[in-house]
A protein has these predicted regions:
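Flexible gly/pro-rich beta->alpha loop and the following alpha-helix that scaffold active-site loops
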Residues: 59-114
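Class I SAM-dependent methyltransferase SAM-binding "motif I" and its flanking Rossmann-like core
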Residues: 91-95, 99-161
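Flexible, glycine-rich phosphate/dinucleotide-binding loops
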Residues: 39, 67, 124
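Active-site metal-binding loops of divalent metal-dependent hydrolases
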Residues: 36, 88, 120
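A conserved hydrophobic position in a structured secondary element of the catalytic/binding core
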Residues: 84, 118, 181
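Short loop/turn motifs at secondary-structure junctions
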Residues: 26, 55-57, 78
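C-terminal and late-domain segments of enzyme folds
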Residues: 1-27, 32-45, 49-52, 129-131, ...
Length: 182
């Protein structure tokens, strides 16, 4: 959302992720990944500016057209929070697989880096969920990173087709226990 002096202002969820990191005495480091929407530079610039105003050091790990860090795994480990934006979870997971980032995310998670995000950036940490990545009809995605061994039903209340789709996917066994959020 727009801030008082910026074109983007972080919401409470970002501040919560930073609080979970436990950082004190220095500016928290937030690594922003916009893979799910093709690493849009305009959003990265706005997020970096919003971070400056909020007292955070925000940087990006871009994978389009090629990684902007020589060692993405080291970059992830150097963050306090890794924040993944929304977009196409199917494309996000495919690009991460091609770049072999799953071990890097697992290492960051094991090291205590807070892994967070919204929409596609939330589903990715779970076993899967339902997505419109393939078109207007919602479909299952079941190849999430599985750091949280559950399904994830994003937009559960705000998009009327999400709830019945998640219920059907849990009912037919495509997804196991599923946590839903909005």
């Amino acid at each position: 959302r727009y801030g008082e002096r910026t074109q983007l202002e972080f919401d409470a969820l970002v501040y919560h992720a930073v609080a979970l990191s436990g950082v004190t005495g220095r500016r928290p480091r937030i690594g922003l990944l916009g893979t799910a929407s093709g690493d849009p530079q305009w959003f990265s610039y706005r997020a970096i500016e919003a971070g400056r105003v909020a007292g955070f050091d925000v940087s990006t790990l871009d994978l389009f057209p090629m990684p902007n860090h020589a060692d993405p795994a080291a970059y992830l480990l150097d963050q306090d929070v890794v924040w993944v934006n929304g977009g196409s979870v199917a494309n996000l997971l495919a690009v991460w697989q091609v770049h072999d980032l799953e071990p890097a995310f697992r290492a960051a998670w094991a090291a205590g880096v807070v892994l967070a995000g919204v929409s596609a950036g939330s589903i990715c940490w779970f076993d899967g969920g339902c997505t419109d990545s393939f078109g207007p009809d919602l479909r299952a995605v079941t190849n999430g990173l599985g750091l949280l061994p559950y399904g994830n039903g994003v937009h559960y209340d705000s998009e009327e087709r999400r709830r019945p789709t998640i219920h059907a996917l849990v009912g037919d066994g495509t997804l196991g226990v599923t946590h839903c959020t909005d």
